[in-house]
Every structure is written in structure tokens, then in C-alpha cells.
């Protein structure tokens, strides 16, 4: 009998050292076994892991350990998404070089990750800021360039004049830079873009085949790609009201059926027609300047008050030359979508209705719901966007929406103006090409040279990587690469003249769009991938990460894989066969009377007759228990993983993260439940030790027959094995843990019996204990290794095969059925599992509860749902 209590603090580092010394998690690329690639989204090296990391990486580790035990060649690597703005901010605020800050953080976080006991192949580790990594990224940039997947184009960008950098739409808040607070300017700048739109339809169509992705993620990508079928219409402009040189206004609409309900046209502030009109209208120019000050993100525009300015320009209705529509500049029309212009049909679009109600333009319903009298159908404050038939639409009246769309398209396609059709059927996508230029130092350098004679010249492959200089300063705003006195000055590789390097660096999303492929052979010094290895190990069988990455990261990775295929680096289209989005870890918030947030470690929870009460541990001061929210530093409701591991051990943290909630839902942090997990660890330790003692008289070989007690325990063991196996395969980890607890209770009940177990039961106890340890080994690997040794098993449990299920033990001798009378539950009945319907009916009708419920009424019929319910109808 070993120590009474399990000592995680001593055991966990010891087993981690053994795993490392034996390199048991190293993956061999030439292993003949079937491969299984499990990958969690790699972390940004901020300096500390948070409790959400523990959950994310535990989920993947359970799967990796399980599949390894099932006989797969498991690839489970780890690396670092290491470029990005925080490193530059640290350089500015703390006077430390981005490189030093990043690698120091990596060292600290790697130590933390190791303490969790993850079965990672650390030999494949890399950081995206390693020149040996981004060398290959630069190579692929040039390959994509040659394949026509990279271009340089003028783009309107958000320019922060203080930080002197381009901001993403999401970084513009109320018209100001998120960090500097400066009023953001709109500028035209040369930007490098990846031509993701070449794959718009393919990226959309392929979503149907990603059947192991969450539906919500596929829907988010579908909406982001945003395919829409419609009609491009060329509205003529009234020459009496239009600036010189402007003759028409093109709009794309998905609702050409509503043309006779049009009340206005609206154009973006960036539309050439708006600029032409503003040149001679100071009030319009001022309006355009004002609306550009709001955030340019779609969310900001959607929530802003709808505003417009009548330019005085009139557009001619394509079906009636005497009917003209006012052209407004509106703050809700974006140049990036469609043509930057729309026609407004307020009766059938809520945004348009709000607009006309504000400006008094009126509305005319042109689609009437079925069964409604067209004469009395009016629209006031709520637009009608449902199905119906056309009204108030001349030759379209009485048609369905689909018929009307087709009729409008046919007529406008047939009508010519200036040698071209007035209407053209088109497919549009919301997806835009991916602008990757960033005016930042800490990113992957873009491998091109600008020569006054030769224009843009790719850096020769022999000169890669273009390495970031270390001797940079951040003493003035803007891009440190641009300020560097020597780095950007080079000789043109084409003509030998003076030239300059590109000083923009790549968007950090590029770094994470192919790292999964690099993990397949990170030792290849000459190419981004070793194709035969990548094609064998890819795609990732199970990818795990937050839903916040559902669109950009996952969509960019899907594009990048296709681009890598087009340039010969991989052979597959999709990078991730399975995608799982885990929930967050959330926690109560605690506040003092003055509203100051307090860290949970400083709070003591007292439970009494009046419920839960929180006090400040140091002073006894009452603390308000606030709502359960996402962990954040600002609300101080964070938990330090190091503290939990130090206090309870990694296995307790892992078990808690898996136990309370389905893994795709948020888990509420609870100190009480963490303590419950710690108690369960000790209980398992005692059960295993007691099983060893109880099994001392067990025969060395399997008994020929088993008595009822031994058979019942074996059924419980193999039933749990079957349920946990299926649960892990379906990623239902919390359900697996419930089955493990249930099985542990069954074993404990047998061990609690005072009588010495018979030899067959002693053998069954040893088997049950071994299966129990193997079942919890993916979740609590350190405890499992310790228990494995106590059981006298050779080697490491991390290298052991998953136990085989004896299917004949899963067949139940009896089954318990719910009994209903006229649909209301009246009791239960237990019958032989192979009982026929007449036997079941007899047993049910003999029940006193059934006789009482029938109260002498004759039985009309008995409905039997096999192995579930019997309903007596009286």
C-alpha cells in the first residue's frame, strides 16, 4: 500500500521529466500507422498563459492522448504567433526591444504550458518571428506574386496622423485612433493585397463539405463571403442637375422587383459623383467631412443615425423617363460594397424607410402579402420584407417576386443606351481582397525592392530571408523600418542602381495562415513544406480554438491553403477537416462599495441562511457579488493558472476544465468545484490502492467463469469504457467525466463490502481498476501514471494501448421501462431484455399502480416503445 494521499506537487514534475527524457510524444513522419493531427490555435506570447489557455489546450490534449492510445501516429505540435503590435508597444512603454520582449515571454509561457502536462511534440516548436520561419513566408509571397495572387493597388485607408500608421476599421472608434486618440484621416495609399476574391465561389461552395465544422462558424463564413445574385442597373442622370462629365449612376440591387417603389438614390461619400458634386457645394463638402468622422467599421455605420444630403442631382427611372429620383449622399452607403450606390425602396427595406421618414420622401408599397387587400395595404413605420405579389408596379402587377425580378432583368437587358445594356445580371460578393500591408516594424518584411528604374522588383530567392534589423528605435511616431538609416537602402538586383526596400510588413494574420502546414516538417531549410510529408499529415484532423476566429483566421487559412496548392506547396484545398470552438472561462465579479473591482483571490465567500455573502479577506469589508462575466484584467475576475497548479496540481485544473460544461459552452469558474475536483483526485488514488489490496488474491489468469458480483462489476467497467470511448470521439468530455464518476462509484461500492472478495471478483476488481485508470488517463495523465505504477503495470500509461471493449458484456440481461397510463407516468417495470411484447404487457397490467389508474376501465391498447416506454391506453 502506497502513501495515503496523492502528492501532485511531487508527482507531476517527475512524470513530465520522464515523458521528456523518453521523447514519447515526438512524432515520426515516416511512421506507417494512420495519422491523426490535432492542433489548438497557437498562442500569442503575451508573457503569461491565462486560464482559457488551460481549457483550450486540455481539450486538445485529451484527444491527442486518446488517439495515441488508439494506435494513431498523433501529431500534436506547439508554436508561437509571435509578431504583432503589443511587442512594439512594450518597446515604447518599457524601453525593451520587441525581439527580447517576445522571446522572454515565450520562455516564460513555455514553462507554464509544460506544467500543464500537455503531450506536445516540442521538437517542432517555432515562433513566427524566427527568420527561419518567415523566410519561407517571404518565399510563398513571391510564389503567390508570380501566380497572380498578390497585387499592389491604391486603396483608401484609415490613417492615424499621430501614430503614422494605417488602422483597421475596427481600430477606429468614434472617428479617432484607438491608441492615439487622433482624428483619423482617409488616405489613398499603395497597399499589398492577396487576391482572395479569386476563390470567393470556391470558398463558399466548399463550406458544404466541412461537415465537422460547427454550423454557426460555417454560417458566419457564408455571410462574410456574402454571395448575392442581382442586377446591375445603369441609371441615366438628368443632365440639367448633374456635374459636367457625369452621365450615369450604376447600382447593384438584389431587389430589382421593387424598382417602382424607388423614392431616392443614395451614394457613398467616397463615390466619384459625390466628390464631383462636393467640389462646387461647400455644404455638401462639409457634410461629407463630418460623416467620415464616424467609425468606418460596418458595425459603427449600422448603429449610427441615418443621415443624408440632397445633392440636387436627379436620376432617371429606367422605365419612365419623366420620373426622376433625388440623389443623396448617405452615411450608410459604403464604397466597398457593390458600386457604392443604391436605390432606396422604403416600403420594403427598414433602413430606407427610416431614411425617407426622416426626410419626408414618402413610400409606395410594391409587394403585398398574400391575402391582403392591395387597396388598404400601407406602410408606416415597419417595412415589409416578406413574400407576396407585386402591386403599384405597372406591368409587374400580380407577379411573384421571382417573376418580377426576372421580368425587370429581361427588359433592362434588352434596352440599350450608349452601346451597352441598361441592365446586366451579376453575382456579387461581400468578400474583399485581403490588404496585408502594415506600417509596423514587428512583422514579416515584405520581400520586394522599389527601384526608380525597374519599379517593383522581387527580392531574389537566394537573398531570403529579408531579416528585420535589431538596431531600431521607437523615439518618433511611424514605422521604425522607414526611419532606419541604412536598412532600407539597397542595390536593385535587376539594374544595380540605388533602390529601397519595402518598409511595410505583413499583416500578422498571414503568419497564422499556414503555420499548421509548417509543423509537418519544420526542419526543411529550403522550402516552406516538404510536399509528400505535408500531404500525408494534412489536413488537420481536429482544430480547436475560439469562435472569435471563426471568420478572419479560418477564412484566410482556407484561402492560403488553396494558394499553397496553386503554387505546389500542398495538394489539399482545406486545412482543417474538423473544427471545434470551445467556450470561455467566466467568473463572478466582485466590487467594493466605491465600485472598485476586487480580485477573487482577495475575497472570501461565506454561505449562510441568507445565501452567499462575499467579504474582503483582509478587512472583513462587505463585497458586492456581481454578474458572471468573461475573465478580464479590467474587472479583476481572473484566475492565475500558476496559483491553481501550485495549490492543487495540473490534473485538478484539467479535470475541472472538462467537467462542468459541454466544451463548446462557457465554464463558470468556481473555487468550490475546483476543491471538489481535488477531492475526487484523492478518491481515485484511494480507490486504486484499495483495489490493489482487494485484488491480491486474484488469479494470474482470467477465470473461466464469473459469478454475479464479478460479472456485474465487469459490465460496469466495460459499459463505462464504451461510453467514455464514444464520448471522447464526439468531444463530449463532460459526459465522459460523468461516466467515470459513475464507474468509480460502482467500484467503490464493491470495495466497501466487508467480505473478502472471491478470486473471480478479485480479478474483476483488478481489471476494473486498470480500466478506470486508463479512462481518466487522457484527462489526468500524471495521476494515471502514478496509479499505473501502483497497479504494477509495466512502462508508461502514456504509451499503453486503449483497452478493448468486450461487447458481450454490454448486453443487458434486463431492461427497465417507464410505464404510463394515458400518457401519464405511473411507475416502472423491469423485464428481461429479450422479453416479447405479450410478456411485457402482462407484467405492466399486473402492476397495482396501473390497475389503480385504470379504475376498472377496459384496456383499449398497449403501446410499447422498445427498451423505453410502455403506454397503456384505457
UniProtKB/Swiss-Prot annotation:
SUPFAM superfamilies (alphabetical): Anticodon-binding domain of a subclass of class I aminoacyl-tRNA synthetases (SSF47323), Nucleotidylyl transferase (SSF52374), ValRS/IleRS/LeuRS editing domain (SSF50677)
One GO CC term, this protein: cytosol
Sorted UniProt keywords? Aminoacyl-tRNA synthetase, ATP-binding, Cytoplasm, Ligase, Nucleotide-binding, Protein biosynthesis
Subcellular localization, per the record?
Answer: Cytoplasm
Where ATP is bound, by residue?
Answer: 633
Short sequence motif named 'HIGH' region, residue ranges:
43-53
Q: Which GO terms describe its biological process?
A: leucyl-tRNA aminoacylation
Q: Which CDD domains match?
A: Anticodon_Ia_Leu_BEm, LeuRS_core
Motif mapping: 'KMSKS' region = 630-634
Q: Which GO terms describe its molecular function?
A: aminoacyl-tRNA deacylase activity; ATP binding; leucine-tRNA ligase activity
Q: Which Pfam families match?
A: Anticodon_1, tRNA-synt_1, tRNA-synt_1_2, tRNA-synt_1g
Its recorded reaction(s) are: tRNA(Leu) + L-leucine + ATP = L-leucyl-tRNA(Leu) + AMP + diphosphate
Which InterPro entries does the entry mention? aa-tRNA-synth_I_CS (IPR001412), aa-tRNA-synth_Ia (IPR002300), Leu-tRNA-ligase (IPR002302), Leu_tRNA-synth_edit (IPR025709), M/V/L/I-tRNA-synth_anticd-bd (IPR013155), Methionyl/Leucyl_tRNA_Synth (IPR015413), Rossmann-like_a/b/a_fold (IPR014729), tRNAsynth_Ia_anticodon-bd (IPR009080)
- What's the top EC group for this one? ligase
Enzyme Commission designation: 6.1.1.4
HAMAP family named in the record: Leu_tRNA_synth_B
Name the protein family: Belongs to the class-I aminoacyl-tRNA synthetase family.
Q: What is this protein called?
A: Leucine--tRNA ligase
Organism, per UniProt? Bradyrhizobium sp. (strain BTAi1 / ATCC BAA-1182)
Q: What's the source species' lineage? A: Bacteria, Pseudomonadati, Pseudomonadota, Alphaproteobacteria, Hyphomicrobiales
Q: What gene is it encoded by? A: leuS
Amino acid at each position: 500500500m502506497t502513501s495515503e494521499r496523492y502528492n501532485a506537487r511531487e508527482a507531476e514534475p517527475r512524470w513530465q521529466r520522464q515523458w521528456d527524457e523518453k521523447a514519447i510524444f515526438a512524432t515520426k513522419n515516416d511512421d506507417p500507422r494512420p495519422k491523426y493531427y490535432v492542433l489548438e490555435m497557437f498562442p500569442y506570447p503575451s508573457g503569461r498563459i491565462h486560464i482559457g489557455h488551460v481549457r483550450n489546450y486540455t481539450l486538445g490534449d485529451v484527444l491527442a492522448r486518446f488517439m495515441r492510445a488508439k494506435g494513431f501516429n498523433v501529431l500534436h505540435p506547439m508554436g508561437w504567433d509571435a509578431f504583432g503590435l503589443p511587442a512594439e508597444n512594450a518597446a515604447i512603454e518599457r524601453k525593451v526591444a520587441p525581439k527580447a520582449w517576445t522571446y522572454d515571454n515565450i520562455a516564460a509561457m513555455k514553462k507554464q504550458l509544460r506544467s500543464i502536462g500537455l503531450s506536445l511534440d516540442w521538437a517542432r516548436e517555432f515562433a513566427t518571428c524566427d527568420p527561419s520561419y518567415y523566410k519561407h513566408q517571404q518565399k510563398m509571397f513571391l510564389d503567390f506574386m508570380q501566380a497572380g495572387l498578390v497585387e499592389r493597388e491604391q486603396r483608401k485607408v484609415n490613417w492615424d496622423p499621430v501614430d503614422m500608421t494605417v488602422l483597421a476599421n475596427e481600430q477606429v472608434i468614434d472617428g479617432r485612433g484607438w491608441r492615439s486618440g487622433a482624428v483619423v484621416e482617409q488616405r489613398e495609399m499603395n497597399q499589398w493585397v492577396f487576391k482572395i476574391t479569386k476563390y470567393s465561389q470556391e470558398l463558399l461552395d466548399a463550406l458544404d463539405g466541412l461537415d465537422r465544422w460547427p454550423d454557426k462558424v460555417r454560417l458566419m463564413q457564408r455571410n462574410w463571403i456574402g454571395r448575392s445574385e442581382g442586377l446591375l442597373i445603369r441609371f441615366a442622370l438628368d443632365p440639367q442637375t448633374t456635374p459636367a462629365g457625369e452621365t450615369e449612376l450604376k447600382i447593384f440591387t438584389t431587389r430589382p422587383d421593387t424598382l417602382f417603389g424607388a423614392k431616392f438614390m443614395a451614394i457613398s461619400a467616397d463615390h466619384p459623383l459625390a466628390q464631383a458634386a462636393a467640389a462646387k457645394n461647400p455644404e455638401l463638402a462639409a457634410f461629407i467631412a463630418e460623416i467620415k468622422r464616424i467609425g468606418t467599421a460596418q458595425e459603427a455605420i449600422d448603429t449610427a443615425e441615418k443621415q443624408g444630403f440632397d445633392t440636387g442631382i436627379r436620376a432617371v427611372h429606367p422605365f419612365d423617363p419623366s420620373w426622376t429620383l433625388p440623389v443623396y449622399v448617405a452615411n450608410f452607403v459604403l464604397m466597398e460594397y457593390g458600386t457604392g450606390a443604391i436605390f432606396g425602396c422604403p416600403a420594403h427595406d427598414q433602413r430606407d424607410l427610416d431614411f425617407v421618414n426622416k426626410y419626408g420622401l414618402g413610400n409606395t408599397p410594391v409587394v403585398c402579402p398574400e391575402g391582403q387587400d392591395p387597396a388598404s395595404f400601407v406602410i408606416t413605420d415597419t417595412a415589409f420584407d416578406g413574400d407576396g405579389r407585386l402591386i403599384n408596379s405597372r406591368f409587374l402587377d400580380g407577379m411573384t417576386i421571382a417573376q418580377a425580378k426576372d421580368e425587370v432583368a429581361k427588359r433592362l437587358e434588352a434596352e440599350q443606351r450608349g452601346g451597352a445594356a441598361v441592365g446586366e445580371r451579376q453575382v456579387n460578393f461581400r468578400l474583399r481582397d485581403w490588404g496585408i500591408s502594415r506600417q509596423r516594424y514587428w512583422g514579416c518584411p515584405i520581400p520586394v525592392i522599389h527601384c526608380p528604374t525597374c519599379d517593383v522588383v522581387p527580392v531574389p530567392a537566394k537573398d531570403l530571408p529579408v531579416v528585420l534589423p535589431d538596431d531600431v528605435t521607437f523615439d518618433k511616431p511611424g514605422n521604425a523600418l522607414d526611419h532606419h538609416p541604412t536598412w532600407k537602402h539597397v542595390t536593385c538586383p535587376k539594374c544595380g542602381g540605388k533602390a529601397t526596400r519595402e518598409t511595410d510588413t505583413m499583416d500578422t494574420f498571414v503568419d497564422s495562415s499556414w503555420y499548421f502546414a509548417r509543423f509537418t516538417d519544420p526542419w526543411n531549410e529550403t522550402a516552406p513544406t516538404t510536399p509528400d510529408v505535408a500531404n500525408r499529415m494534412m489536413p488537420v484532423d481536429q482544430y480547436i480554438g475560439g469562435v472569435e476566429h471563426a471568420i478572419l483566421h479560418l477564412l484566410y487559412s482556407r484561402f492560403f491553403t488553396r494558394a499553397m496548392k496553386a503554387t505546389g506547396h500542398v495538394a489539399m484545398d482545406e486545412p482543417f477537416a474538423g473544427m471545434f470552438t470551445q467556450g470561455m472561462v467566466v467568473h463572478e465579479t466582485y466590487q467594493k462599495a466605491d465600485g472598485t473591482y476586487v480580485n477573487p483571490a482577495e475575497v472570501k465567500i461565506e454561505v449562510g441562511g441568507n445565501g452567499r455573502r462575499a467579504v474582503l479577506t483582509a478587512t472583513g469589508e462587505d463585497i458586492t457579488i456581481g454578474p458572471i462575466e468573461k475573465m478580464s484584467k479590467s474587472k479583476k475576475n481572473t484566475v492565475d493558472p500558476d496559483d491553481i497548479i501550485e495549490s492543487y496540481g495540473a490534473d485538478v485544473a484539467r479535470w475541472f476544465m472538462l467537467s462542468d460544461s459541454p466544451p463548446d459552452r462557457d465554464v463558470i469558474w468556481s473555487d468550490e468545484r475546483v476543491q471538489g475536483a481535488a477531492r475526487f483526485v484523492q478518491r481515485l488514488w484511494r480507490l486504486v490502492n484499495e483495489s490493489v489490496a482487494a485484488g491480491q488474491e486474484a488469479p494470474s489468469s482470467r477465470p473461466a467463469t464469473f459469478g454475479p458480483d464479478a460479472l456485474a462489476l465487469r459490465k460496469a467497467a466495460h459499459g463505462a469504457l464504451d461510453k467514455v470511448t464514444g464520448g471522447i470521439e464526439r468531444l463530449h468530455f463532460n459526459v465522459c467525466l460523468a461516466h467515470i464518476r459513475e464507474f468509480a462509484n460502482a467500484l467503490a461500492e464493491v470495495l466497501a463490502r466487508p467480505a473478502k472478495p472471491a478470486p473471480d471478483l478479485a480479478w474483476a476488481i483488478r481489471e476494473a481498476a486498470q480500466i478506470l485508470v486508463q479512462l481518466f488517463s487522457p484527462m489526468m495523465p500524471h495521476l494515471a501514471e502514478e496509479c499505473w505504477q501502483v497497479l504494477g503495470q509495466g512502462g508508461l500509461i502514456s504509451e499503453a494501448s486503449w483497452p478493448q471493449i468486450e461487447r458481450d458484456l454490454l448486453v443487458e440481461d434486463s431492461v427497465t421501462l417507464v410505464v404510463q397510463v394515458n400518457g401519464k407516468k405511473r411507475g416502472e417495470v423491469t423485464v428481461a431484455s429479450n422479453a416479447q411484447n405479450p410478456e411485457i404487457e402482462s407484467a405492466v397490467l399486473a402492476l397495482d399502480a396501473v390497475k389503480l389508474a385504470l379504475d376498472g376501465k377496459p384496456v383499449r391498447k398497449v403501446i410499447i416503445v422498445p427498451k423505453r416506454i410502455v403506454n397503456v391506453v384505457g
